[in-house]
Amino acid sequence: MSKLVIVESPTKARTIRNYLPQDYRVEASMGHVRDLPASAEEVPAAYKDKSWANLGVNVEDHFSPLYVIPKSKKKVVKELQTALKNADEVILATDEDREGESISWHLLQLLQPKVPIKRMVFHEITQEAIRSALENCRDIDENLVHAQETRRILDRLVGYTLSPLLWKKIAWGLSAGRVQSVAVRLIVQRERARRAFKTAGYWDLKAELEQNKNPFQAKLMTLGGTKLANGSDFDPNTGALLPDKQVVVLDEAQAIALKERLTGKPWAVVNTEEKPGVRKPSPPFTTSTLQQEANRKLGISARDTMRVAQKLYEEGYITYMRTDSVHLSDQAVTAARNCVQQMYGKEYLSPQPKQYTTKSKGAQEAHEAIRPAGTEFRIPNQTGLKDRELALYELIWKRTVACQMADARITQLSVLLKVEDAEFRAAGKRIDFPGYFRAYVEGSDDPDAALENQEVILPPLKVGDRPNCREIDTVGHETQPPARYTEASLVKTLESEGVGRPSTYASIIGTIIDRGYVQMRSKALTPTFTAFAVVSLLESHFPDLVDTGFTSRMEQKLDEIAIGKTQWLPYLQGFFLGESGLENQVKVRQDQIDPAIAKAIELENLAAKVKIGKFGPYIEIPQGEEIITASIPQDLTPADLNPEQVAVLLKQKTEGPDKVGIHPETGEPIFILIGAYGPYVQLGEATEENKKPKRTSLPKGVKPEDVTLEMAVGLLALPRNLGEHPESGKNIKASLGRFGPYVVHDQGKDGKDYRSLKGDDDVLTITLERALELLAEPKRGRGSRTPLKQLGLHPEDQEPVNLFKGPYGVYIKHGKVNASLPEGETEETITLEKALPLLAEKAGSGKKTSRKKATTTAKGTKKTTSKKASATGTAKKTTTKRTTRKKAASPDQSSEAG
């Protein structure tokens, strides 16, 4: 007999296995083993006629959730049940947060072990931590389970109640979510502010001066004793000067005249000032600050940051990555201070060990901050990590070490200079002692380079000095609208407002991008027309559900449930039932919402009407007695739609496409058109005989008005054959694809090898030599998988059989068939002969068409002890007809659970 330890993932299982005695068997649940039904297909036959069946929550019987085992988890559950037969003790070692507690609880309810059960928790996977956790097991925390379950039910109630309303009133397949919709509204509000923003222009002067051959710069501050205007002096809604501002506003002509008046006049230093100051290091990372800094420094999305951090945690490199605590254990503080002393010297160590306190709204679970694992921190270049894993680990290491370093000491320098009636100011900064800057500068990837950039050197100057003015320049400025949210700034705002939980931000941002509410534009989150329509409807009819304050108070209630301060059932009843509950609100407003109004979007500074149609957004404008409509290209957002763009779309609709010229070889006309996916060139007209003329999209950044005949001919000739690869003898071509221009090497049976073009590369002019350089570079991104090992060719089709490393461990791949390595096999021991039967078994199992019923448990409201299964929920028998369309996006916002 053995002791069965259950964790979430195979990677975590492999790492933990190294630290446990021989008689411990570690298995993975692969995440949650039960959940609410994801679709009508998963609802068991016994419940399909219930009015609440599609909701998956029996609101008539104490909000009893209907839990099912997803089809993808049935094999896992069966394997765990088999492993349980040989166990004399079960240890549930899932993560130490609400989701982890919930997974353990579900495993307990599902497996119903007859042997002793323990709950083991840890926040890092090291030998010391695992052994300590093993000696300090506890029971399942029912309050944490209630909090997770309440959050899950809330997300389902909001998603499944509001989403169908959006389908009826705006467009099929839309979704609403408890946190998702608030995030979308923030992004839409920012875009509205940008559209309403009125730009104001103003000018100032910049002087290049010299003292004892040492150059420095100064900026005009006052004229005739009155302060010069800057951007903060203007009203963002009108562009006019704010009424209480007593400032001088220069236009271009006045700035030029002032420059000419001051040129050649003597300058004098009238005041100097030095202000000493300190810069303190930032606290170690929480989930949200890690996401923000990884996005700023490394350009990694919140979703990818969490994926990489999860891997680092499961492999024992960092502590648990879902936390809002900035606290460090005494051992961690000691480890960080040892690193400082060894690498930078004692003078860079803070005089006393530093501890930090969490200031974010609603901070909860008592984890540590994210830091390198263990009592001795591994130096990044000695970990053996590569690529993103190394970059993220190094970021965490630097931040943790820096938090125990001495403050940086700086001096702010200010020199006031006068010429005629104008006063200029030269500002400088001197770093007297770099302190923690030596290891970490927030927002910078290179501390040494950042250190140089931090300093602004001024020559020694004193009152009465007369520096030489070498040049005066006029500088024009325009006030800027508020910046669009990036992933980093949205995460920061969500956390500061107390909306959602840091552990859910990555999935929320991923969801709003995947659902088409937001597009990424140069790291900025740009809302789509659909986002505007949905937010307008929710603001008008369900304002609480998109209000940050209301959503923040919901989070506080969930936190209170987690510590037993608030009862979960009364809270759910108050939210959903009764006259003011969500269920009744939706019923009442369903008849009040006019689809024609819901589909219309009002945009600042735009006379044309924008509407959401069956095939996407379009513009509508009256022209005499007619109403002209024109589709809006899919990649065009409200940010891009202005009166000029509207005129272009309407002109194309009424007058037909612009003609670039005649193709020199075919004699056919070449047109430029704008379609649902943006502008493209077309060879010839679409006729009955030629229904699909040759078309090619314009490369990103190329405007329709900039297209020449030569460029159009080149685009229509794509793909270009560049020549043969010197090693394979196969063709290399250049072309345009969904993700932009690329080159491709056709390797025959080995598939096609793609590389994106870079920088100044032009798909129309790239040479074979340059293509070979690109192909020689290692692949990047999602499709860049290089086999760990090539096992050989499959005897049936001579296609390669390879080993790859995926998120759940090493697997075998042949064509489209993937097979996991069986227990006991490793990358070194697996052979082609062993792989073939595994692939055959996997391929055979994929051909089965019989479908088993979903295993279900309808959970009641009473929970006795953690070892007992929950009661089966019952409900009054009613029949509700529902139409299910497979293509609709699921309204469930399970990704928001956290």
Swiss-Prot record:
Active-site residue numbers: Y320 (o-(5'-phospho-dna)-tyrosine intermediate)
GO MF, one annotated term: DNA binding
Role of this protein: Releases the supercoiling and torsional tension of DNA, which is introduced during the DNA replication and transcription, by transiently cleaving and rejoining one strand of the DNA duplex. Introduces a single-strand break via transesterification at a target site in duplex DNA. The scissile phosphodiester is attacked by the catalytic tyrosine of the enzyme, resulting in the formation of a DNA-(5'-phosphotyrosyl)-enzyme intermediate and the expulsion of a 3'-OH DNA strand. The free DNA strand then undergoes passage around the unbroken strand, thus removing DNA supercoils.
Highest taxon of source: Bacteria
InterPro entries: Topo_IA, Topo_IA_2, Topo_IA_AS, Topo_IA_cen, Topo_IA_cen_sub1, Topo_IA_cen_sub2, Topo_IA_cen_sub3, Topo_IA_core_domain
EC number(s) stated in the UniProt entry for this protein: 5.6.2.1
Compositionally biased region (Basic residues): 848-866, 878-888
Similarity-based family: Belongs to the type IA topoisomerase family.
SUPFAM superfamilies: Prokaryotic type I DNA topoisomerase
Domain Topo IA-type catalytic, first and last residues per copy: 141-583
Spans annotated as Disordered: 840-898
Low complexity composition bias: residue spans: 867-877
Named cofactor requirement(s): Mg(2+)
CDD domains to which the protein is assigned, alphabetical: TOP1Ac, TOPRIM_TopoIA_TopoI
Any GO BP annotation: DNA topological change
Reaction catalysis annotation: ATP-independent breakage of single-stranded DNA, followed by passage and rejoining
Subunit description: Monomer.
Marked site (Interaction with DNA) residue numbers: H32, R151, R152, D155, Y160, W167, R322, R515
Chain spans, region Interaction with DNA: 175-180
Keyword terms: DNA-binding, Isomerase, Magnesium, Metal-binding, Topoisomerase
HAMAP family found in the cross-reference section: Topoisom_1_prok
Domain Toprim span(s) in chain numbering: 2-126
NCBIfam families in UniProt: topA_bact
The protein's name: DNA topoisomerase 1
Any Pfam family: Toprim
Residues involved in Mg(2+) binding: E8, D95
